[in-house]
């Protein structure tokens, strides 16, 4: 049975995925599908490290700037639109290149994870857990997951309410443990997954510099927009890069304190990304910071894969 080949480029935040993808795409006749859960939103660009207008012109991108943060958008929507993008790219005779850092979304696209049925049932389940979170807080929500599925809970930080909500939602929709999803998956595509990583200190230094660069590019203004619209339920409220500035806007903390908090949150997020990638996906790892030939090495891996 024919299985569509795709290339996936993953790695922690700030490692250089976009840069490498833009180098590789013309050489392998590829178009890029964003595998980032936040780049789909039109209103937030700096904090989501969205490709620039020039980069978007260089190579055709999919799942970037297609929704408003006030729209409902779930992993099921991402998979549906991602599959459509893969088909469109393949129909042209081009190679789909998925690039991003949202491990669960990428995994759900590459593999047939059981995500439950669409429709009102999905919405009502999400609302139920969201209400529980609002009434009891992130720690209690995580404890609830720990009771239902301790294996899944161990892989999620108690303060990461977004992932806890997702796990509880999947359990409710499917009637199966979130941690058992991996045992029930089958591949949707024949995927070569290339991962970028380097030693932790270098990755963390890049993250810190990247936050400074984002601040210079106008991140604070973008965060203020998110803060000013917090009364309307939207997707960016809990996103790293925005919520860290809320205490500054409310007068509780200094700007420097919030910038440092963002750097810390970004470093922790990078660590969680790597943990997910290493446990959930089969990856060919390359080091873009130590290896000057990383582009050539990635290209060789891709050519070998495509010629199989």
Swiss-Prot record:
SUPFAM superfamilies hit by this protein: P-loop containing nucleoside triphosphate hydrolases
Quaternary state and interactors: Monomer.
Organism listed in the record: Lactobacillus gasseri (strain ATCC 33323 / DSM 20243 / BCRC 14619 / CIP 102991 / JCM 1131 / KCTC 3163 / NCIMB 11718 / NCTC 13722 / AM63)
Site residues by UniProt (Interaction with substrate tRNA): 102
GO biological process: tRNA modification
Stored InterPro entries: Dimethylallyltransferase, Guanylate_kin-like_dom, IPT, P-loop_NTPase
Recorded coiled-coil stretches: none
Gene3D superfamilies: 1.10.20.140, P-loop containing nucleotide triphosphate hydrolases
Region (Interaction with substrate tRNA): 36-39
Sequence similarity: Belongs to the IPP transferase family.
Essential cofactor(s): Mg(2+)
Binding residues for substrate: 13-18
Protein function: Catalyzes the transfer of a dimethylallyl group onto the adenine at position 37 in tRNAs that read codons beginning with uridine, leading to the formation of N6-(dimethylallyl)adenosine (i(6)A).
GO molecular function: ATP binding; tRNA dimethylallyltransferase activity
E.C. number: 2.5.1.75
Protein name: tRNA dimethylallyltransferase
Domain of life: Bacteria
Residue positions binding ATP: 11-18
Entry keywords, A to Z: ATP-binding, Magnesium, Nucleotide-binding, Transferase, tRNA processing
UniProt entry tagged with the keyword ATP-binding: yes
A Pfam family of this chain: IPPT
Catalysis performed (reactions): adenosine(37) in tRNA + dimethylallyl diphosphate = N(6)-dimethylallyladenosine(37) in tRNA + diphosphate
